[in-house]
C-alpha cells in the first residue's frame, strides 16, 4: 500500500463509511475521521461502536435478550462520544498493512490529529504485538490503550510450510481436479467489475452482515484498474466468474480485502477452492498471507496461525476525565483476554 491510492470521497467507495479520509505525512498515511450522525449500518472499519457492539449484537441475533443488552451498551458508549473517532493508518479495507516508513510516521501523525481533532477519540487498528512492538511502545508513551479487537490468521509462506495439513492437501487436489481457469487480473472490464461486486455482496452483505464495508462498483474499478490491487478470478468452462479475491500486496505481506463466490453455482467446495487458489498464489509469491478474521476452524485446519489483533485508542481532551477513565477501564478489563479465549468463543 502506498501513495498510489487515489484521492476520492470515501462514500464513493464505501457507501456506509460515515467517515471522511485524508492523507498525511511524507508516506501518505490515510486518516479516517468519523462524521455524525453516522449511517445506521456504519462499517466496522470506521466505527468502533459497529466493530465492538453492533457486529456482536448481529452475531447474537438468535439470542434477542443478549443482542438488546449489547446494543444498549453500545448506546451508552455512543453518548460518551465513541462515534467521533479518527483512525490513523486506516485504509478503507479490513486489514491495513504499513511499510516501515509509515509506521515511523504514525506517532507524529497521531500527535497532529490529537491537536486538529481535540474532541475525537484517536485510534489505530490492526495492531499485532509480534509485528508492531516498537510502535506499541511509542503509542503507550502517548497514553494510547490496547483494546482486543479480533483474532486474525497468518500463513507464513516466505520459506514454505514444512508440512502441508491434510485439509489443505484435499483443497489443493480439489482445485486441480475441477480444471477451472484461474487468472490474477491487473485490469477488469465493466462486466467483470459488475460480477465481482455481485459476488462480494452475496457473501459479505447478504450472507454475513450489512456492517461490513458496502463497497461500490467504483471501488472495485479503481483499486484494480489503477493497480492498487490485483483480482484473482476463478472461472468455469463457460468463462463465467464463479469466485474472486482481491489481492493487496505490501512488501512481503499479502492481504485479502474482499472475496466472493457464487453460492448458487454447483461447484464442489466453493470456498475451499477459492482458498486453495489464494494459498497457491501466496506460496508462489513466497509471501506472508494475512488472512484476516473469521472462519477460524477452517483456517486452523489448513495451517493458519492465530494472533490477537488490537485497536489502540486515545481519549479526547475533556474537563472531567470521564472518557479517559472509560478507556483505561476498558483496557484493564480486557487485558487478560488472550487468543485462546476468543477461539473458544468461535473466533
Predicted regions and their residues:
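Conserved donor-binding loop and adjoining core beta-sheet/short helix segment
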Residues: 15-114, 241-264, 310
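A conserved beta-strand-loop-helix scaffold within acyl/acetyltransferase catalytic domains
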Residues: 1-26, 33-39, 124-147, 157-266
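Hydrophobic, Leu/Ile/Phe/Ala-enriched alpha-helical segments that form helix-helix packing faces
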Residues: 56, 60, 109-117, 139, ...
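Active-site/acyl-donor-binding loops of N-acyltransferases
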Residues: 142-162, 288-347
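Aromatic (often tryptophan-rich) hydrophobic motifs at membrane interfaces
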Residues: 219-324
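Acyl-donor-binding surface of acyltransferase catalytic domains
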Residues: 66-181
Amino acid at each position: 500500500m502506498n501513495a498510489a491510492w487515489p484521492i476520492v470521497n470515501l462514500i464513493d467507495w464505501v457507501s456506509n463509511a460515515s467517515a471522511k479520509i485524508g492523507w498525511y505525512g511524507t508516506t501518505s498515511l490515510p486518516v479516517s475521521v468519523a462524521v455524525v450522525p453516522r449511517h445506521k449500518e456504519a462499517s466496522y472499519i470506521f466505527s468502533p461502536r459497529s466493530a465492538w457492539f453492533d457486529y456482536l449484537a448481529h452475531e447474537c441475533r438468535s439470542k434477542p435478550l443478549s443482542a438488546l443488552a449489547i446494543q444498549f451498551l453500545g448506546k451508552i458508549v455512543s453518548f460518551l462520544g465513541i462515534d467521533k473517532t479518527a483512525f490513523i493508518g486506516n485504509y478503507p479495507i479490513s486489514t491495513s498493512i504499513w511499510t516501515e516508513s509509515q509506521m515511523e510516521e504514525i506517532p507524529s501523525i497521531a500527535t497532529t490529529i490529537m491537536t486538529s481533532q481535540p474532541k475525537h477519540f484517536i485510534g489505530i487498528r490492526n495492531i499485532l504485538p509480534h509485528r508492531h512492538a516498537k510502535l506499541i511502545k511509542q503509542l503507550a508513551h502517548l497514553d494510547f490503550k490496547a483494546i482486543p479487537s479480533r483474532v486474525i490468521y497468518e500463513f507464513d509462506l516466505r520459506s514454505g510450510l514444512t508440512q502441508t495439513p491434510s485439509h489443505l492437501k484435499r483443497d489443493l487436489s480439489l482445485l486441480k481436479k475441477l480444471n477451472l481457469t484461474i487468472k490474477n487480473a491487473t485490469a477488469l472490464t465493466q462486466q467483470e467489475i459488475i460480477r465481482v461486486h455481485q459476488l462480494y455482496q452475496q457473501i459479505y452483505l447478504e450472507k454475513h452482515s450489512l456492517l461490513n464495508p458496502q463497497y461500490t462498483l467504483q471501488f472495485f474499478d479503481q483499486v484494480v484498474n489503477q493497480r492498487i490491487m490485483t483480482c484473482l478470478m476463478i472461472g468455469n468452462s463457460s468463462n463465467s466468474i464463479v469466485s474472486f479475491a482481491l489481492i493487496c500486496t505490501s512488501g512481503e505481506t499479502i492481504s485479502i480485502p474482499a472475496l466472493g463466490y457464487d453460492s448458487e453455482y454447483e461447484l464442489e467446495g466453493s470456498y475451499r477452492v477459492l482458498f486453495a487458489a489464494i494459498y497457491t498464489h501466496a506460496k508462489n509469491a513466497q509471501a506472508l498471507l494475512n488472512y484476516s478474521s473469521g472462519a477460524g476452524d477452517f483456517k486452523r485446519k489448513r495451517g493458519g496461525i492465530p494472533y490477537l489483533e488490537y485497536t489502540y485508542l486515545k481519549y479526547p481532551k475533556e474537563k472531567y476525565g470521564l472518557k479517559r477513565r472509560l478507556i483505561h477501564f476498558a483496557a484493564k478489563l480486557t487485558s487478560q483476554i488472550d487468543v485462546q479465549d476468543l477461539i473458544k468463543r468461535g473466533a
